[in-house]
Amino acid sequence: PTEAAKNLYQVWKKMIVEMQEAVEDARRYMGGRSESLKIGVLDSHKSESYLWEYVEAFHDLYPDISLAVESERPEVLHKKLMENELDVIFTVRYDMETISWTGHHMELVKETPFTVCMRADNPLVDKQVWEVKDLKECNLVMISALHLPSYNSMIVELCLKYGFFPNIVYNAQNAASQIYNLLKENDVFICDKYHKDYGSSHVISRPIKNTKSGVVMVWKNERKKYLCQFIDVVRNCRQHEQQENIQNGRMPEEEK
């Protein structure tokens, strides 16, 4: 695009954002709510499996504050957080470990091992817990590095750690389309239990031992009013979960 087109886009974008904020302000006013926080989650995640608890706990403490939640692809979440269109985002753990988040804070809120998803006719389908070395015999359906480089590099580094390079057979445009590209019995893709396709009736999911995945919360240094309170709620929920695990003798999932 030309410079004129870029400038026009920025002007229109600013106007649209201002219009959306005005509509949101009016909605909050009509509903008796004075403030709002904007939260971003992954469109490929079952975000309700962790976010619902935080939202309920926050509303109990701050009933006058509305929470606006939107789901997007990882790269869109990153961009919106940097441009202050979102106050806090929840993304995958490997984003924290492979992306430079200068000027941001990150915190792990959910821990779980990686999961391998496969067809029902996969030769290793009866193996209940996989090892990384089992991936050596598989064809990996990845996400294109053009769209999500952190996913690609994470899997390559994981396999190289165990002495082999992954056999990549396809690069999908996004996480949602990986399941539709399991075309042969040896085709698999890697995710974790928060992925929307985990537990799907169309694929078999197995944990991969000695691996670490999960969900991280990311926010900028410039803290909006009530963001600190929301972060505290998330931390308290996590602390309560850890205490329950200790009392019930349960180990962290990633150690299983």
Per-region residue spans from a language model:
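Extended ligand-binding regions for polar small-molecule ligands
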Residues: 16-17, 133, 214-247
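N-terminal winged-helix
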Residues: 17, 24, 30-62, 66-68, ...
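Secondary-structure junction motif
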Residues: 48-51, 92, 138-162, 227-231, ...
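Beta->alpha turn/N-cap motifs
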Residues: 73-74, 90-96, 119-120, 184-186, ...
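Beta-alpha-beta core module
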Residues: 99-107, 112, 176-223
